[in-house]
């Protein structure tokens, strides 16, 4: 009996100790299990060696990209600034464990500085930060899988095509790959064929049309090895509302002012001033565009071509306006209007331009106007000449000059019989002679002795009356010359108006074609 009892007591003690240990392990917190797991994983772990059992093995890194924000597209410096998350997964055989040994812990987060991570960088970086700067923690799983998603803000170089600016669409890319390891050491695998846009914050200036990832492998000139990379291609389209309101519409309105230059009358004297003002305004807008678009000589933006085209036409309008003003102020004393100018610009062109010159209205009989017809210029003179000549001044001179006049008459007309013809006859003769000159007909001859007109005989005129008639004739000729000059000046002004109207329609057509040419190519390319 003694021996079985002595053998049972040690067995009971062992069971009691085992139960005590099991109870203590169950009462230990979860953090203690992770602490033991950390010690288990990183005791003797070397973060500088590739996580492969054999040197010839390749580490497969699954790579994906998630974009959070398209911060900016700098056309001047040709850079695209993005806020992205780099999704990376690979397998590390040295970081495996049995979850049952560590209180069923299947995954833990560890600082990325403690483990091996692939040196994946952005190849086409534009600001010097090629790698990830914020080292977030990595997610480890019990089967050895490592998942690391660090955020990063990259400035990648992007070739900007401003042909259809501001209705342009850009193709930018981000090229990621290992900087140190070639394809025999690290190979990349595209995690997703498209960029993850689930967490994308919409931009107010650009819209992402498409974003895909593509695997590439390339042999560079520096090395004999082949290096893999995954390139993400972004197709982004500019939202043109801002530039339409602040750039395009003002440009179109200023261009339309060029048309008004040819509708402005030449007498106002502001045609050249308006042309220069429009030219300066277009120059300011062209300077604004040069501040936005990249400094390249490969292509000129569509809006720049439109502004340059308009500036050329404004310059031509200044030249044409100077010519029109020269034509407008021509006169018979400086220029003679050729026959072809009269027939072409006064007869042929106005009919095609729907221009109708108002006819010259002559004043009706019994009415007085500013200018009388040439045949009636002497009407007032005739009335003045038919007044009695026995005025006071003539009576005084008659006594002094009577003897001298009689001697001159006898010498000039020896056969003429002195007659007491009335002064009314002399006035009648002189008026008829002057009227004959004014009407273009022959002046009546001086009647000789024995010839009678009615009951009166032809008599000579006194020198004072002859001088008066010469003054009247001079005034009549001067008024007729003024009428002719005025008519020619009006013809030149009408020629200038016809030239203005020709270029008015030409500029309207050019303005419409330029507007259509501005919007049609982007529309056909599907960018509007």
Curated annotation (Swiss-Prot):
This is Neuronal acetylcholine receptor subunit alpha-2. GO terms for molecular function: acetylcholine-gated monoatomic cation-selective channel activity; transmembrane signaling receptor activity. GO terms for cellular component: acetylcholine-gated channel complex; neuron projection; plasma membrane; postsynaptic membrane; synapse. Disulfide bonds join 158-172, 222-223. Neuronal AChR is composed of two different types of subunits: alpha and non-alpha (beta). CHRNA2/alpha-2 subunit can be combined to CHRNB2/beta-2 or CHRNB4/beta-4 to give rise to functional receptors. Both CHRNA2:CHRNB2 and CHRNA2:CHRNB4 nAChR complexes are heteropentamers with two subtypes: LS (low agonist sensitivity) with a (CHRNA2)3:(CHRNB2/4)2 and HS (high agonist sensitivity) with a (CHRNA2)2:(CHRNB2/4)3 stoichiometries; the subtypes differ in their subunit binding interfaces which are involved in ligand binding. Residues 328-501 are cytoplasmic. Residues 1-23 form the signal peptide. Keywords: Cell membrane, Disulfide bond, Glycoprotein, Ion channel, Ion transport, Ligand-gated ion channel, Membrane, Receptor, Signal, Synapse, Transmembrane, Transmembrane helix, Transport. Glycans are attached at residues 54, 104. The gene is CHRNA2. InterPro entries: Neur_chan_lig-bd (IPR006202), Neur_chan_lig-bd_sf (IPR036734), Neur_channel (IPR006201), Neuro-gated_channel_TM_sf (IPR036719), Neuro_actylchol_rec (IPR038050), Neurotrans-gated_channel_TM (IPR006029), Neurotransmitter_ion_chnl_CS (IPR018000), Nicotinic_acetylcholine_rcpt (IPR002394). Residues 390-427 are annotated as: Disordered. It catalyses: Ca(2+)(in) = Ca(2+)(out); K(+)(in) = K(+)(out); Na(+)(in) = Na(+)(out). One of its GO terms (biological process) is monoatomic ion transmembrane transport.
């Amino acid at each position: 009996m003694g021996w079985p009892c002595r053998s049972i007591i040690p067995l009971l003690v062992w069971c009691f100790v085992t139960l005590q240990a099991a109870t203590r392990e169950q009462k230990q917190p979860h953090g203690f299990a992770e602490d033991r797991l950390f010690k288990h994983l990183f005791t003797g772990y070397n973060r500088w060696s590739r996580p492969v059992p054999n040197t010839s093995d390749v580490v497969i890194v699954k790579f994906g990209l998630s974009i959070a924000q398209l911060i900016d597209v700098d056309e001047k410096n040709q850079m695209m600034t993005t806020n992205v998350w780099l999704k990376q997964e690979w397998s590390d055989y040295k970081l495996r464990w049995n979850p049952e040994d560590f209180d069923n812990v299947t995954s833990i987060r560890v600082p990325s500085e403690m483990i091996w991570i692939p040196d994946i960088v952005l190849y086409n970086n534009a600001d010097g930060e090629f790698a990830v700067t914020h080292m977030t923690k990595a997610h480890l799983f019990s089967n050895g899988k490592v998942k690391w998603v660090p955020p990063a803000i990259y400035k990648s170089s992007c070739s900007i095509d401003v042909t259809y600016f501001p209705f342009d669409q850009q193709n930018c890319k981000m090229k990621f790959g290992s900087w140190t390891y070639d394809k025999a050491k690290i190979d990349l695998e595209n995690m997703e064929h498209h960029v993850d846009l689930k967490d994308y914050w919409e931009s107010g200036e650009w819209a992402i049309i498409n974003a895909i990832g593509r695997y590439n492998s390339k042999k560079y000139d520096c090395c004999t090895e082949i290096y893999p990379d995954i390139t993400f291609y972004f197709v982004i389209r500019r939202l043109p509302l801002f530039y339409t309101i602040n750039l395009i519409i003002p440009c179109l309105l200023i261009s339309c002012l060029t048309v008004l230059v040819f509708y402005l009358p030449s007498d106002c004297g502001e045609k050249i001033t308006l042309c220069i003002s429009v030219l300066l305004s277009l120059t300011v807008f062209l300077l604004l565009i040069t501040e936005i678009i990249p400094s390249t000589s490969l292509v000129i933006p569509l809006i720049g071509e439109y502004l340059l085209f308009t500036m050329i036409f404004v310059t031509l309008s200044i030249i044409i306006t100077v010519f029109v003003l020269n034509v407008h102020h021509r006169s018979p004393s400086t220029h003679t209007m050729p026959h072809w100018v009269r027939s072409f610009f006064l007869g042929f062109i106005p009919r095609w331009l729907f221009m109708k010159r108002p006819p010259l209205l002559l004043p009706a009989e019994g009415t007085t106007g500013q200018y009388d017809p040439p045949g009636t210029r002497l009407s007032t003179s005739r009335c003045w000449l038919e007044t009695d000549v026995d005025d006071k001044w003539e009576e005084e001179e008659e006594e002094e000059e009577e003897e001298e006049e009689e001697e001159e008459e006898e010498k000039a007309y020896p056969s003429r019989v002195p007659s007491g013809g009335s002064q009314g006859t002399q006035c009648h003769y002189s008026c008829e002679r002057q009227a004959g000159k004014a009407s273009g007909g022959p002046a009546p001859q001086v009647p000789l002795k024995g010839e009678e007109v009615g009951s009166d005989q032809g008599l000579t005129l006194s020198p004072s009356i002859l001088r008066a008639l010469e003054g009247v004739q001079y005034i009549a000729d001067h008024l007729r010359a003024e009428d002719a000059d005025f008519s020619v000046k009006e013809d030149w002004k009408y020629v200038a108006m016809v030239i203005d109207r020709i270029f008015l329609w030409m500029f309207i057509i050019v303005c419409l074609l330029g507007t259509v040419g501005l919007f049609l190519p982007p529309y056909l390319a599907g960018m509007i």
